[in-house]
Amino acid sequence: MKQNKINKKFVYLISPNKIPDINFYDDLALVLSSKKISFFQLRLKKETNLNKLIIGKKIKKICNKHKVKFLINDDPLLAKKLNADGCHLGQKDMDLIKARKILKNKIIGVTCHNSINLAKKAINDGADYLAFGAFYATKTKTVKYRASLTVLKSIKKITSLPIVAIGGIKLSNYKKLLLNKANFLAISGYIWNNKKYKPLEAIRKLK
């Protein structure tokens, strides 16, 4: 996976925890049409595998239309079934080496929290990108680890892999992460749960 410099497609969009209604797919298409998004990750922790498959098929078509890479959270087998572009692995998910056997040359990213040691292991195991966070407080998931801006500078000294920043990213703080060398920003709540802006308006504010 090629590393992006700061550009207009720095958003790594994550789905809401639950697909709210049928209108979500229209909102997603509008957001992806903004041309600010490189990746979309389907993250539905509480859905059945069957529902994930049904939802994933719909979303994959939308991602393909807008040339956005479609990734699955935690589940390499589902990613293979959907012929997704790859998957994202947390530290408690399937081992990266096992996931690579399933997904071959697909994109596999790994959560590294705030740890350079976890990042080094992921690099050695063949990760395509590294994710650090949470950088800020977030309501999307329970935060067990907080990351500092210094980890972004430190990781850049040892790898050229793309770096994804995660956690509580919104209009008031996103530029600081880009200026500190994050290649992509994983964003969810700011887009889907924004009380001030609709999804398309919210994504357009990120310039």
Swiss-Prot record:
Organism (species): Pelagibacter ubique (strain HTCC1062)
Protein name (database record):
Thiamine-phosphate synthase
| Enzyme class, broadest EC rank | transferase
The cofactors named for this UniProt entry are: Mg(2+)
Its UniProt entry gives the catalysed reaction(s) as: 2-[(2R,5Z)-2-carboxy-4-methylthiazol-5(2H)-ylidene]ethyl phosphate + 4-amino-2-methyl-5-(diphosphooxymethyl)pyrimidine + 2 H(+) = thiamine phosphate + CO2 + diphosphate; 2-(2-carboxy-4-methylthiazol-5-yl)ethyl phosphate + 4-amino-2-methyl-5-(diphosphooxymethyl)pyrimidine + 2 H(+) = thiamine phosphate + CO2 + diphosphate; 4-methyl-5-(2-phosphooxyethyl)-thiazole + 4-amino-2-methyl-5-(diphosphooxymethyl)pyrimidine + H(+) = thiamine phosphate + diphosphate
Residues bound to 2-[(2R,5Z)-2-carboxy-4-methylthiazol-5(2H)-ylidene]ethyl phosphate are T138, K139, T140, G168
Residues bound to 4-amino-2-methyl-5-(diphosphooxymethyl)pyrimidine are Q41, L42, R43, L44, K45, N73, T111, K141
Gene for this chain: thiE
Looking up Pfam families in the UniProt record yields:
TMP-TENI (PF02581)
EC numbers:
2.5.1.3
* Record keywords: Magnesium, Metal-binding, Thiamine biosynthesis, Transferase
**Which Gene Ontology cellular component annotation is one that this UniProt entry carries?**
cytoplasm
Describe the family membership recorded for this protein in Swiss-Prot or TrEMBL.
Belongs to the thiamine-phosphate synthase family.
Enumerate the Gene Ontology biological process terms: thiamine biosynthetic process; thiamine diphosphate biosynthetic process
* UniProt cofactor note: Binds 1 Mg(2+) ion per subunit.
Q: Which residues form a coiled coil?
A: none
Its pathway is:
Cofactor biosynthesis; thiamine diphosphate biosynthesis; thiamine phosphate from 4-amino-2-methyl-5-diphosphomethylpyrimidine and 4-methyl-5-(2-phosphoethyl)-thiazole: step 1/1
Task: List, in alphabetical order, the Gene Ontology terms for molecular function in this entry.
Answer: magnesium ion binding; thiamine-phosphate diphosphorylase activity
Q: Which residues bind Mg(2+)?
A: D74, D93
The function of this protein is: Condenses 4-methyl-5-(beta-hydroxyethyl)thiazole monophosphate (THZ-P) and 2-methyl-4-amino-5-hydroxymethyl pyrimidine pyrophosphate (HMP-PP) to form thiamine monophosphate (TMP).
